[in-house]
Amino acid sequence: MWRHGLRVTEAVSMRRDQINLQRARAWIQRLKNSLSVEQPIDGEELRAIKSYLNTRDDKLPWLFVSERGLPMTRQAVNYLIDEAGKRASLEVHPHMLRHSCGYYLANEGTDLRTMQDYMGHRDPKHTVRYSRVAGRRFEGLWKK
């Protein structure tokens, strides 16, 4: 969820056919009238997805399934993230992963248009919020 800036519903709605393991690409079907986009899958992430799919002996279309073979639910994701937060003594919620992706991209100096496309925002005003707090954007400003 973090690496692709996914909303919980976008993550639990993903299907196997949205992942192209040979090309290391994921089709991200955005919600809320956002723009869908194909994104690269990085090495570590690609290995984790392959490993996860190799443990499954089903032909279910969903990428993420419960132990009962049903699609993962929003509630299950909320629970898992809440429990992980408790173990780390942090108060977290799933949408923080999406926001963290935006802040990370901004701090890495990603241009606003690329961030907008990556996050699936139709309106740049939703993307600007991430760059506004990116302190690194001022580094080297006067070194020319």
Predicted features by range, described:
Residues 1-13, 108-110, 121:
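A short, glycine-centered helix-capping/turn motif at helix boundaries
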Residues 4, 8-9, 13-51:
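Conserved tyrosine-mediated DNA breakage-rejoining catalytic core shared by Y-recombinases
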Residues 15, 106, 119, 130-131, ...:
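DNA major-groove recognition helix of helix-turn-helix
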Residues 19-21, 73, 90-91, 111-131, ...:
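Short, polar N-cap/turn motifs at the start of nucleic acid-interacting alpha helices
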Residues 28, 81, 127-130:
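Mobile genetic element proteins and their domesticated derivatives, centered on retroelements
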Residues 37-40, 132-144:
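DNA/chromatin major-groove-contacting recognition/catalytic segments
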Residues 39, 78-117:
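Short, basic (Lys/Arg/His-rich) helix/loop patches that form interaction surfaces
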Residues 42-91:
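Active-site/catalytic core of tyrosine-dependent DNA strand-transfer enzymes
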